[in-house]
Design a protein with these regions (language model features):
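Flexible mid-to-C-terminal extensions adjoining Fe-S/redox cofactors in radical SAM and related proteins
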Residues: 1, 6, 255, 259-331
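Conserved alpha-helical substructure of the radical SAM core
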Residues: 1-98, 102
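Residues immediately within or flanking Cys/His clusters that coordinate Zn2+
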Residues: 11, 15, 19, 237, ...
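Cys/His-rich metal-chelating microdomains
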Residues: 17, 21, 25-28, 243, ...
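Residues that line or immediately flank small-molecule/substrate-binding pockets and catalytic motifs
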Residues: 29, 60, 110, 180, ...
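Radical SAM enzyme [4Fe-4S]-AdoMet core and its adjacent flexible, acidic
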Residues: 36, 82, 102-105, 109-111, ...
C-alpha cells in the first residue's frame, strides 16, 4: 500500500441509539435502531487491530449508553487498542469507574454556553449538567478530556464562552474538536446549520483566543479551504484525512470513506481492506480531487489546503467544492 494512504485511525459507530434528539443528527431517528451484539462488535475491533489500526474512536448515536460498553472497552484495551470515545452523556450506564482504566480520551459535545439552550437543542432536560458532571469526573481523575463544538448559527458566537464556562467548573480541557454540520441525516435538505464567512471569522477569532489563553489544542475535524480564512488561521487547517488516513466503520463492519458519507461505502472490515482502500473508485476520485475548480489545482497552497470538505454541500450529490470556497482566491 502507498504509505501516504495508510489507515491510522478508525471511527467506529457502535450504536445509532441516543437519548438526545438533536435536529441535525446524522444518526437519523427511526432507522437502524437495532443494538449490535457484544460478540460481533468485538470481532470488528479485533479485525481492526489485526489490520494494525490501533487508534480507535467509539461514536454513535451515543456509544456510552450501549448496553455492553464496559465489556467492549475492556476487550479492546486488553487487546492493544488506544481508545477514545465521543458521547453526548459519558454516562456509561452508571459504571464510570469501570471504564477508567480502559479508555484513554473522553470527549463530549457541547451545543451552547447556556445550559438551558444546550438542553433545548438536544431536547433533554438536564443534559448539560449530566455531561458536565461526567466530564469533571474524568478530568478529576487525570484522564484526557476534549469538547466537540458544532459550528452552527445557533452557537457560533458563544463557542469561547462554552469552553470557558466548562474550565471555570474545574475541568481541564486538553483539546477542542471543531465541526461543521452538512446536509445529512436529520439535516438533509436543510442549509440552516451552515455558517457564513462572517460567522466563520468570528469562530476562528474565538478559537485562537482559547488556544492563546489556555493552551488548548485545536482540531478541525472537517477542515476549511484556505481561501475562506485569514492567513493567520492556516495553522489550524489540513487536507481532509477521511479517505487518506481515517476510515469509518459501522457496527456491522461496513466501511465508508467518512462517517457522514455513507453514500460512498465500499465493503467490509472483514474483506481485503488494503485492496479496497487503494482501488475503490470513489476513494480514488476523492484523492484525485478532480471535482475541485481549476483555480484550486493551480493554487500554490493546494496541497496544504486540499480544498476543504468534499461533501459540505450534500453528500448524496457526490464530491463538490466546499460551500465556503472562494475558488482559490487567497485572503
Amino acid at each position: 500500500m502507498d504509505k501516504r494512504y495508510k489507515i491510522k485511525q478508525a471511527i467506529v459507530h457502535i450504536t445509532y441509539t441516543c437519548e438526545h434528539h438533536c435536529p441535525m443528527c446524522y444518526a437519523n431517528a427511526g432507522i437502524r435502531k437495532e443494538e449490535p451484539s457484544l460478540e460481533y462488535l468485538c470481532k470488528v475491533i479485533d479485525r481492526l487491530l489485526e489490520l494494525d489500526i490501533k487508534d480507535i474512536t467509539l461514536v454513535g448515536g451515543d456509544p456510552a449508553i450501549y448496553t455492553h460498553i464496559v465489556e467492549l472497552v475492556v476487550h479492546a484495551k486488553k487487546n492493544g487498542a488506544m481508545l477514545s470515545i465521543l458521547s453526548n452523556t459519558l454516562e456509561f450506564n452508571g459504571k464510570r469507574e469501570d471504564v477508567l482504566d480502559f479508555i484513554d480520551v473522553y470527549e463530549g459535545t457541547i451545543h451552547h454556553s447556556d445550559p438551558g439552550k444546550h438542553d433545548s437543542f438536544c431536547k433533554v432536560e438536564g443534559a448539560y449538567d449530566k455531561l458536565i458532571n461526567n466530564l469533571k469526573f474524568f478530568s478529576d481523575r487525570g484522564k484526557s478530556v476534549g469538547v466537540a463544538l458544532n459550528m452552527i448559527p445557533y452557537n457560533y458566537n458563544v463557542l469561547a464562552d462554552s469552553v470557558e464556562s466548562i474550565i471555570e467548573k474545574g475541568i481541564k480541557i486538553d483539546h477542542i474538536i471543531m465541526q461543521r454540520i452538512i446536509q445529512f441525516g436529520r439535516a438533509t435538505g436543510m442549509n440552516n446549520f451552515e455558517i457564513s464567512s462572517e460567522m466563520l471569522g468570528e469562530v476562528l477569532r474565538q478559537v485562537e483566543s482559547l488556544e492563546n489563553k489556555y493552551g488548548i489544542k485545536v482540531i478541525f475535524e472537517d477542515p476549511l479551504p484556505f481561501c475562506a480564512i485569514d492567513k493567520k488561521y492556516y495553522k489550524y487547517m489540513h487536507p481532509c484525512e477521511w479517505g487518506i488516513s481515517k476510515i469509518s466503520v459501522d457496527y456491522k463492519g461496513n466501511l465508508s470513506r467518512c462517517g457522514a458519507d455513507v453514500f460512498h461505502s465500499f465493503g467490509s472490515v472483514f474483506d481485503d481492506v488494503d485492496y479496497l482502500w487503494t482501488t475503490d473508485d470513489n476513494i480514488k476520485a476523492f484523492r484525485e480531487k478532480k471535482y475541485l475548480p481549476v483555480k484550486c489545482h493551480e493554487c500554490s497552497l493546494f496541497f496544504k489546503c486540499g480544498g476543504g470538505c468534499p461533501i459540505s454541500r450534500n453528500p448524496e450529490h457526490g464530491f463538490t467544492a466546499d460551500y465556503l470556497s472562494k475558488s482559490g482566491k487567497i485572503i
